């Protein structure tokens, strides 16, 4: 049966824009702190594990069974309230979501499957966000739709014929395009993508050789190159980053093209990181909506070294719930267990470290696997708890919002759930907050109850946090400093515009007007002083370098000072 004629139980995110989050209603009851006081063929397995019939995935799909809204993995369709702990089989960022403001948000818009930094744009009508999806050809998009529809209509179907899709020339070509666009540092072999990007003949030969390696199953992942990045401006904490080779990044991107549509059908609606048509603004919409509904007690959870602690065996079990293709499973296992190579700065000697747990931060497929491992938690909290809390998650950063008095019990059960899956809460950062008394910070925003000046109604006030504002100012200072005065002013202002546009794109939401005005004033004054000293002027700091001159002659970007609630 043609994939276009398949009828599904729910509209497809790949065709009908499913998943676009609606904005919470503007007209709300007066709710506030005061009022709230009172090729291996194991067989296609469908449903309960019975043998299913063969499905050709590269152009057609089987007619799905009865439509089902149950998208949980490995759990009963009739979810029961949990008692002592959350039910469900629970097994299985590139950086933490607290660094979202550092993400690149300006650049050429694209489609695709694997997502580093979702900040802008709602995406295309077929459900793939411009920033979150690898730009794919029509035939590859058709494959993705087939996979998504099959997974959506049959929540317990296991896909057993996927490996052959990985070495299709169109899939590998799309994957290579993504790697070229993202650029990035070389892996342990020192090979970069510049040659492939400039020489079509070399590109075609390289892709053909890679496809042959995959087809003959002689491809083996290389070790990842371990580097360290500073997590803060003070340079007190470092994050280990594993950089795969270009070949490994291309194959991982191809795997993401094939696997993302399958798991996208299972992911919970309250998970927003590294997904099509999802972004931080929608996560904040859900937080605000929960607060307005009376869920003012919040478990502000922080996972300790999440990406480094994910156990391989449990994660592979989670993958196997949807994928029974042994070749794909072995490939994912090889990526997870690839050793890391670290070069000693003093001696220059290389040290090889085995990887017994965790998914390498820097791998293309790592965000997808990290989302998968916490998917059961999303469903357990939002659907299987009798208290009916709301959990909003962005990668390893999440909030559990509940009614007053329920937070302590939920935090205990959360701790027990995570320990059973060999994960840890950061006890120093995890806290239980009554938002009627103090605010919270989430995804770079601060949220606190405030009373309107005119309406006198209490509302959740959302604006960029002080930490996010400080990060922006530090970045602007790093560009407008004494060492850059010998550079052309237009080029320096262009760098400033890239920083401010990206930051504003991430935080142009909620009640950000006042903060945006302050940040614009800071950037203008900083640029004025830089220009004044560059040209050695003795007067006219403000009278000569006016706002109009900065915007007209030097092309300084003007901030948007009207921050409407965004969908």
List where the protein language model places each region.
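Core structural elements
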Residues: 167-172, 221-227, 231-233, 340-341, ...
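Amphipathic alpha-helical blocks
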Residues: 171, 185, 197-223
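Non-catalytic, polymerase-adjacent accessory regions of viral genome-replication enzymes
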Residues: 1-201
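A glycine-rich phosphate-binding loop feature that marks nucleotide/adenosyl-phosphate handling sites
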Residues: 394-397, 430-438, 496-497, 516-524, ...
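Short, solvent-exposed helix-loop connector elements
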Residues: 239-240, 354-359, 461, 477-492, ...
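Conserved polymerase palm-domain catalytic core
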Residues: 208-209, 213-228, 232, 266-435, ...
């Amino acid at each position: 049966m043609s994939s276009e004629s398949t009828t599904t139980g729910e509209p497809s995110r790949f065709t009908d824009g499913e998943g676009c989050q609606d904005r919470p209603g503007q007209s709300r009851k007066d709710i506030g702190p005061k009022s709230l006081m009172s090729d291996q063929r194991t067989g296609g397995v469908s449903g309960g594990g019975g043998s299913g019939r063969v499905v050709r995935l590269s152009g057609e799909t089987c007619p799905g069974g009865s439509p089902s809204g149950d998208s949980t993995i490995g759990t009963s369709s009739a979810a029961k309230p949990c008692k002592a702990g959350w039910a469900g089989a629970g097994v299985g960022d590139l950086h933490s979501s607290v660094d979202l403001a550092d993400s690149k948000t300006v650049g050429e818009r694209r489609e695709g499957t694997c997502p580093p930094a979702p900040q802008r744009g709602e995406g295309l009508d077929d459900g793939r966000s411009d920033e979150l999806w690898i730009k794919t050809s029509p035939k590859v998009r058709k494959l993705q739709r087939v996979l998504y529809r099959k997974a959506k209509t049959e929540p317990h179907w296991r896909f057993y014929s996927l490996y052959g899709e990985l070495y299709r020339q169109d899939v590998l070509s799309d994957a290579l395009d993504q790697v070229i666009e993202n650029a990035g540092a070389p892996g342990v072999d020192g090979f970069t993508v510049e040659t492939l990007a400039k020489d079509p003949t070399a590109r075609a030969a390289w892709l053909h050789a890679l496809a042959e390696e995959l087809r003959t199953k002689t491809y083996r992942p290389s070790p990842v190159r371990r580097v360290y990045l500073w997590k803060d401006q003070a340079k007190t904490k470092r994050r280990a980053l594993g950089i795969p080779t270009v070949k490994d990044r291309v194959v991982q991107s191809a795997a993401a093209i094939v696997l993302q549509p399958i798991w996208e059908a299972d992911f919970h609606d309250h998970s927003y990181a590294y997904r099509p048509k999802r972004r931080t603004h929608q996560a904040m919409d859900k937080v605000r909506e929960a607060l307005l509904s009376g869920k003012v007690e919040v478990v502000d959870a922080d996972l300790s070294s999440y990406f480094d602690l994910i156990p391989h065996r449990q994660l592979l079990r989670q993958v196997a719930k949807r994928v029974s293709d042994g070749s794909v499973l072995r490939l994912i296992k090889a990526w997870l267990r690839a050793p890391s190579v670290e070069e000693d700065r003093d001696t220059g000697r290389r040290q090889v470290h085995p990887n017994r747990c965790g998914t390498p931060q820097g791998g293309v497929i790592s965000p997808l696997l990290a989302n998968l491992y916490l998917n059961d938690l999303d469903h357990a909290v939002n659907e299987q708890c009798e208290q009916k809390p709301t959990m909003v998650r962005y990668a390893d950063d999440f909030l559990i919002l509940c009614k007053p008095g329920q937070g302590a019990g939920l935090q205990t059960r959360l701790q027990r759930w995570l320990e059973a899956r060999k994960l840890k809460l950061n006890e120093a950062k995890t806290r239980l907050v009554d938002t009627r008394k103090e605010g919270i910070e989430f995804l770079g925003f601060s949220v606190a109850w405030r009373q309107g000046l005119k309406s006198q109604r209490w509302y959740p006030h959302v604006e960029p946090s002080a930490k996010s504002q400080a990060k922006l100012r530090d970045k602007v200072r790093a560009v407008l400093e004494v060492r850059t005065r010998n550079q052309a002013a237009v080029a320096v202002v262009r760098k400033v515009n890239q920083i401010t546009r990206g930051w504003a794109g991430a935080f142009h939401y909620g009640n950000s007007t006042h903060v945006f005005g302050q940040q614009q004033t800071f950037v203008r004054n900083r640029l004025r002083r830089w220009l004044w000293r560059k040209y050695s002027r003795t007067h006219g700091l403000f009278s000569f370098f006016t706002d109009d001159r900065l915007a007209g002659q030097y092309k300084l970007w003007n901030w948007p000072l009207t921050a409407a609630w965004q969908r």
